[in-house]
Curated annotation (Swiss-Prot):
Residues 37-47 have a biased composition (Pro residues). This is Lipoprotein LpqB. Its main location: membrane. The gene is lpqB. The keyword Zinc does not apply.
Amino acid sequence: MRRIAALWLCALMVFAVGCAGVPSSSSPQAIGTVDRPAPPSLPKPTPAMDPDVLLREFLKATADPANRHLAARQFLTESASSTWDDAGSALLIDNVVFVETRAPERVSVTMRADILGSLSDMGVFETGAGALPDPGPIELVKTPDGWRIDRLPNGVFLDWQQFQATYKRHTLYFADPTGKTVVPDPRYVAVSEPDQLATELVSKLVAGPRPEMDKTVRNLLGSPLRLRGPVTRADGGKTGVGRGYGGARVDLENLSTTDPHSRQLLAAQLIWTLSRSGINGPYVLNADGAALDDRFAEGWDTADVAATDPGAADGAAAGLHALVGGSLVRLDGQRAPRVSGQFGQMPGQTAASLSRTGQEVASIVTLRPGAPDMASSLWVGPLGGNASQVLDGRSLTRPSWSLDDAIWTVVDGNNVVRVIQDASGQPARIPVDASAVVTRFPGAIAELQLSRDGTRAAMVIEGKIVLAGVEQTAGGNYALTYPRRLGYGLGETAVSLSWRTGDDIVVTRTVAQSPVSYVNLDGVNSDGPSRNLLMPVKTVAANPSAVYVADGRGILQLSGSAAEDPGWSEVRPLMSAGALPVLPG
């Protein structure tokens, strides 16, 4: 997994310690469905190629999906090309070994390889691990033009190195169910023409989110809306789209959205998708021949949709808080006084989080930690005010707040619960259906943290990182769906986690050499800096601008850029054994 361990951190600033490998700058598109020129770097078969070389070049050529993998089909006989089914997901493989059985005019080959991940026909990349199951024999025959593949298994196997060179990562954005922000949906695509990028991105927004997000987000660009024509420069020109000051013009048709807020969300989806992909504004957005919003007829900018900024830090004004000696304190310059009210006085607090606004607190009080008769309770109330007990159990995980101010926690290892305030003002405890998670990943859930957009839950289960969608069911309740593992390279060493942004998670671990790591939505993991940390490293709390961890001495903050050899610096007023960082989230 080291080959993919640092693929995603290039976009991070303070947190990046090195960049390599994963394609990071292209648009999503369905594999094998787009007619366009193949990238010039793809190999072609030659008469002098030996079977082994021809097979390796074939695996490289499969990296281009254009025209139903036309580049790869050049390596096949006509009969093999007519029967090869290249639809569906592709497996990304490395360390390929071919074992040949030769005859003068025919060669039979078995293939062994390591699986590094998969790429769906929507461009969704997920990391994987393990040996490639035997796909069946591959047969080559000698033709007048040299060796060609005459029989091969269905499906696509992508050479990892060629995948890196051909595919780029871009992020689509969809609206969260509350309409407060936008949700990332990373995709990978092979693209060679920069001026086609914006059109491909918008086309994929119209096509909709990946299956696991279908019931967790809203798509204001969904059917019957469609793209009228290619995205152009703001003035209608076809070259230089989104580069320099040329801007981008998007013409839509069949718009059914009439209320201003929904149109604002539609614009936010487009603008954040294009902007985060390096396609600069102004963004001229038209629907059915008229401006989407007359106020922005000359063009939108990111400032016009800043309220939905996916990189904004929730409750940033609240600042850093901490549990010190079991009570809640706030960082105030070089001091850390207890907060006023009950949370500053109540002893035995072992985990806490602030609401998204930073004005409310949810805190866990634990009696007799670790003992057979251990007891935990969840207390909720305004920061600086009184607290009310709303839930109890033997163990409760660190609380996490959703965008609708519900508090999520896990009771006694497996029972996920939402706590909300009902119409009478009393707390209501509502079970969350976590059956999909506990069936696939048995074991106690030691941590559950909701993403900043509230549509995903990241969990620590038996030391593994597990991601699931947060889906509201027809009856109004919630379920955790589509669980999958992230960060195979981390093994089973995770202790705590926190969302830094909607696309990446900070993880503390039991590994002294790499006590802090990062993992993104694709599942790619990378090691963070370890300088000045002492084991064990416990709770982590993060937001887009800061990462705090607790080690045996107290709370430390990640500081310095990648060029400055980043390390961990002490938060002096919070250097107390057992202190734990607390942020909104």
